[in-house]
């Protein structure tokens, strides 16, 4: 049923440190739900969330990124079980220098079974990390629970985030159109023309998916 599927491969959501708002925690649940229901993967970046136990000055205590990570995992599990299509993917990202990084790395797979975890890293973050953090990260990678993602910036110095496959870096709510042009039905003499027309169609489509 292609009419109900999204014409994109993956997308990115950077969660702001607020329950409400267009890019807040609650908005991210809706965003992730829509992506998973319609077959797109989504990379959820949680580094802006306050660490576990942090006070906001209004009598509220933060529960931390890992606690919210469990909601995304449960959301993915329920949607996969209830939907006809079961091809959504959800990856949680956290910067290496976030105060809750060790908890993020060492949380048992049984507590986050329906999401992948990825640590955003660069040379500076690695050099500044404690030995405990480095050891936990290396063990997490060896166990298959943790993936690595390089932090990157666009030409204007604005940070862009890795999507699910880590091949494309996007701003928050950006979409990746990792598609293909099938030229199997073309004659050899029509391959060039078919490729150009196919790419033009994909470019037109991509502008409608943001």
Give names to the regions the model predicted:
Residues 1-210:
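Extended catalytic cores of very large enzyme megasubunits
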């Amino acid at each position: 049923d292609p009419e109900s599927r999204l014409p994109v491969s993956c997308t990115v959501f950077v969660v702001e440190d607020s329950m409400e708002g267009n890019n807040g925690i609650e908005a991210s649940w809706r965003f992730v739900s829509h992506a998973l229901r319609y077959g797109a993967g989504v990379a959820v970046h949680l580094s802006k969330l306050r660490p576990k136990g942090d006070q906001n000055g209004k009598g509220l205590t933060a529960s931390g990124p890992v606690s919210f990570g469990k909601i995304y995992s449960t959301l993915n599990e329920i949607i996969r079980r209830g939907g006809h299509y079961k091809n959504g993917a959800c990856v949680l990202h956290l910067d290496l220098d976030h105060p809750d990084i060790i908890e993020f790395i060492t949380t048992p797979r049984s507590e986050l079974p329906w999401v992948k975890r990825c640590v955003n890293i660069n040379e500076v973050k690695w050099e500044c990390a404690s030995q405990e953090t480095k050891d936990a990260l290396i063990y997490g990678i060896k166990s298959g629970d943790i993936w690595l993602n390089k932090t990157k910036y666009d030409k204007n110095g604005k940070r862009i985030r890795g999507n699910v496959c880590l091949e494309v870096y996007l701003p928050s709510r950006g979409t990746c159109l990792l598609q293909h042009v099938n030229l199997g039905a073309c004659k050899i003499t029509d391959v060039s023309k078919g490729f150009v027309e196919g790419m033009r169609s994909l470019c037109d489509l991509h502008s409608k998916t943001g």
